C-alpha cells in the first residue's frame, strides 16, 4: 500500500497541481508582504480573496469575458485594500480587528449575494453558464490516465510577479520607502516622503494581489464559486510570509511547499479518508511555523 501511495503522489499531475494550488497562496502572500513591509499585518486576506473570487466569476458571467472578470476582482480587491488603509492609517483602528471584521463580512456578504442570485436557501455553489471558462489561457501537457494535464497561464505570470516584487522591494527607492514607512517613519519624513502615502500604496497593492488571487481561485483553479471557498488560504498566505521572512522568493517557495502538500492530499484520498487528508495542508503549515520557531530559538541561544 505504501508503494501505491508513493506512486500516486509522485506523478506529473501532482506537480502540475502543486503549481496551480501554490499560485493562489503565492499571490495572496505577495499582497500580505506589501502591507508587512509597510508595518502592517493584514490578516483580512481571506475576506479580500473571497470578494475577489465572487466579483471575478460574476463579472465574467455577466460579460462573457474572463478579462472583465479579472478586472472586476482586482478593482474590488483594491477598493477593500483602500478601505483597510483608511481604517488603519487614518482612523488608527486596530489592524487585527479590521482584518477579522473583513473576513467575517466577506463571508456574510458573498453568501447573501450568492443566494440572492440563485435563489438557494442553503449553502450553494455558483456554476457559470457561459463559456468564458474555456477561453482562459492554459498550457496543455497532454493526457495521463484519462486526465488532462493543464497549467493555467496565471502560474508563470505569478512567477514573473514574484520577480518584479523582489526587484521592487530590494532594488527601487519605492521599495526602500515602503519598508521605511513601517520601520522608520520619522526618517522617511525627514527626506520629504510621506510614510502614510507609502502605507496606502502597500494596502492597495495588497488588495490588488488578493483580488487577483481570488479571481484565479474561482475562475481558474476551481472554475466555480462556492460559499467560503477560500478555506483559510489567506491565513496560510500569512504563514508563508512569516516563514519566508517577507522575501518574495522565499514566500513563493513556502507557497510551493503548501501546494505540494495540497496536491499530495488530493492524490491520497483514494487511500486515506478525505476528512483526514483535508487537514494535511493546515498540518503542513503548522509544521512550517514550528520549524521556523525552533530555528529562531536556536539562533537566540547562540547569540546569548
What are these regions (language model features)?
Residues 165, 173, 183-197, 266-304:
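Cytosolic-side transmembrane-helix boundaries in multi-pass membrane proteins
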Residues 34-52, 89-102, 177, 222-235, ...:
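Short, non-helical or kinked segments that cap or interrupt transmembrane helices
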Amino acid at each position: 500500500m505504501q508503494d501505491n501511495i508513493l506512486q500516486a503522489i509522485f506523478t506529473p499531475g501532482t506537480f502540475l497541481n502543486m503549481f496551480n494550488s501554490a499560485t493562489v497562496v503565492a499571490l495572496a502572500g505577495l499582497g500580505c508582504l506589501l502591507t508587512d513591509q509597510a508595518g502592517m499585518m493584514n490578516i483580512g486576506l481571506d475576506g479580500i480573496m473571497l470578494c475577489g473570487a465572487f466579483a471575478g466569476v460574476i463579472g465574467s458571467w455577466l460579460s462573457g469575458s474572463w478579462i472583465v472578470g479579472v478586472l472586476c476582482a482586482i478593482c474590488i480587491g483594491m477598493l477593500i485594500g483602500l478601505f483597510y488603509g483608511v481604517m488603519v492609517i487614518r482612523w488608527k483602528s486596530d489592524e487585527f480587528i479590521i482584518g477579522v471584521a473583513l473576513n467575517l463580512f466577506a463571508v456574510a456578504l458573498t453568501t447573501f449575494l450568492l443566494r440572492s442570485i440563485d435563489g438557494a436557501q442553503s449553502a450553494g455553489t455558483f456554476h457559470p453558464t457561459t463559456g468564458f471558462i474555456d477561453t482562459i489561457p492554459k498550457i496543455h501537457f497532454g493526457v495521463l490516465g484519462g486526465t488532462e494535464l493543464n497549467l493555467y497561464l496565471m502560474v508563470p505570470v505569478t512567477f514573473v510577479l514574484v520577480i518584479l516584487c523582489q526587484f521592487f522591494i530590494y532594488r527601487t527607492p519605492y521599495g526602500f520607502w515602503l519598508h521605511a514607512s513601517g520601520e522608520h517613519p520619522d526618517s522617511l519624513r525627514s527626506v520629504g516622503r510621506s510614510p502614510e502615502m507609502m502605507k496606502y500604496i502597500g494596502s492597495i497593492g495588497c488588495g490588488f494581489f488578493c483580488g487577483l488571487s481570488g479571481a484565479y481561485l474561482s475562475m481558474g483553479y476551481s472554475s466555480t464559486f462556492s460559499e467560503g471557498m477560500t478555506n483559510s488560504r489567506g491565513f496560510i498566505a500569512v504563514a508563508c510570509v512569516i516563514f519566508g521572512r517577507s522575501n518574495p522568493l522565499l514566500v513563493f517557495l513556502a507557497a510551493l511547499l503548501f501546494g505540494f502538500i495540497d496536491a499530495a492530499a488530493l492524490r491520497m484520498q483514494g487511500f486515506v479518508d478525505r476528512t483526514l487528508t483535508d487537514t494535511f495542508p493546515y498540518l503542513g503549515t503548522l509544521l512550517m511555523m514550528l520549524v521556523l520557531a525552533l530555528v529562531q530559538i536556536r539562533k537566540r541561544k547562540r547569540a546569548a
